[in-house]
Swiss-Prot record:
GTP binds at Q11. SUPFAM superfamilies: Tubulin nucleotide-binding domain-like (SSF52490). Dimer of alpha and beta chains. A typical microtubule is a hollow water-filled tube with an outer diameter of 25 nm and an inner diameter of 15 nM. Alpha-beta heterodimers associate head-to-tail to form protofilaments running lengthwise along the microtubule wall with the beta-tubulin subunit facing the microtubule plus end conferring a structural polarity. Microtubules usually have 13 protofilaments but different protofilament numbers can be found in some organisms and specialized cells. This is Tubulin alpha chain. Belongs to the tubulin family. Disulfide bonds: none annotated. GO terms for molecular function: GTP binding; hydrolase activity. It catalyses: GTP + H2O = GDP + phosphate + H(+). Its EC number is 3.6.5.-. It is found in: Cytoplasm, Cytoskeleton. Coiled coil: none annotated. It comes from Leptomonas seymouri.
Amino acid sequence: MREAICIHIGQAGYQIGNACSQLFC
């Protein structure tokens, strides 16, 4: 679930997706 969210956010904004990846993924 979290991985899918990270991918979705990454599509919206690479910087936000990268931050999410560091925090959750």
